[in-house]
């Protein structure tokens, strides 16, 4: 199953009012589809808006689902007064990890570099995503300030040098993780790795059990410290794609460092359906507004 596919069907196309938008902006100064983003501003009459970055779920298989992600989750964020930046990233078929987190960080740097051009208030940049997008959003949050990281004999460039805006910060200020896979060493029955045909195998380019150091580098929990932004984690207890225990593991690790704002388990929530609902969308928007020091709606 492709992470995020079902939720795309469930919350297919929302109705939007008058909004300002720019689409298919390349944030890496190249020609790759996976390096494009769309910017949407609410119809609020302000000169600039605080920002939430949005990342689609696809089991890391897709490089062009930014519009789907916006259709699925954009409206509550716009209604909450945020500019929404929905981004593509390279797929696991295009490039192996850490290319995907390099892309996310490049997009955030681009946002800061071009804030005036697109009426963005970068005093606050939140980030959210569902499924594999939840994983990348979480990883962006826990790797604020991390350039290169080594586990065992494996060293990876987490920040990367994608694009022309490398002098700008890739920091994010708050994270909402929607049912993201977190610990790939415990994806199978909450206890062990999945096999060579799993999405994470495609992402890292090998059988997970044979690349435990890479799985540790892939895991947002590896990097958690007291300086990380606050997190809201949302997961349905009937999710058969990404086990609910993944978010329990993450919740416990975030709590230990004081970085968890709230953990929401949605009863009977699946991988999108039921988990995506008016109440959880409101929780997301209120969380971001609180972290951005905006009045609650």
Whereabouts are the PLM-identified features?
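N-terminal cap/lid segment of alpha/beta-hydrolase-fold proteins
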Residues: 17-47
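Catalytic histidine-centered segment of alpha/beta-hydrolase-like enzymes
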Residues: 269-278
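Short amphipathic alpha-helix adjacent to the substrate-entry channel of hydrolases
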Residues: 66-85
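Mobile cap/lid helix-loop segments that gate and shape the active-site cleft of serine hydrolases
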Residues: 30, 146-163, 186-223
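Alpha/beta-hydrolase active-site loop
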Residues: 95-116
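Short beta-strand element of the alpha/beta-hydrolase
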Residues: 48-58
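Primarily recognizes the serine-hydrolase "nucleophile elbow" in alpha/beta-hydrolase
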Residues: 109-190
């Amino acid at each position: 199953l492709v992470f995020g596919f079902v939720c795309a069907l469930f919350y297919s196309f929302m109705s939007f009012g008058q909004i300002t938008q720019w689409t298919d902006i390349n944030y890496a100064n190249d020609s790759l589809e996976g390096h494009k983003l769309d910017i949407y501003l609410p119809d609020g009459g302000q000169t600039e808006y605080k920002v939430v970055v949005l990342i689609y779920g696809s089991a890391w298989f897709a490089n062009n689902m930014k519009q789907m992600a916006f259709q699925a989750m954009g409206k509550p964020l716009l209604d909450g007064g945020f500019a929404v930046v929905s981004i593509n990233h390279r797929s696991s078929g295009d490039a192996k990890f850490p290319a995907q987190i390099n892309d996310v960080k490049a997009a955030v740097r681009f946002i800061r570099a071009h804030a005036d051009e697109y009426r963005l208030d970068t005093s606050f940049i939140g980030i959210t995503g569902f499924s594999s997008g939840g994983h990348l959003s979480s990883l962006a949050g826990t790797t604020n300030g991390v350039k290169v990281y080594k586990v065992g004999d494996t060293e990876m460039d987490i920040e990367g040098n994608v694009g022309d805006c490398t002098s700008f910060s890739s920091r994010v200020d708050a994270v909402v993780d929607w049912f993201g896979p977190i610990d790939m060493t415990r994806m199978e029955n909450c206890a062990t790795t999945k096999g060579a045909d799993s999405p994470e195998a495609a992402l890292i380019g090998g059988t997970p059990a044979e690349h435990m150091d890479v799985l540790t580098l892939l895991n947002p929990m590896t990097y958690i410290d007291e300086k990380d932004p606050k997190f809201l984690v949302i997961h349905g207890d009937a999710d058969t794609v990404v086990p609910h225990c993944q978010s329990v593991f993450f919740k416990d690790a975030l709590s230990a460092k004081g970085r968890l704002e709230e953990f929401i388990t949605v009863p009977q929530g699946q991988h999108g359906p039921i988990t995506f609902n008016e109440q959880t969308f409101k929780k997301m928007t209120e969380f971001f507004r609180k972290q951005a020091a905006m009045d609650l709606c």
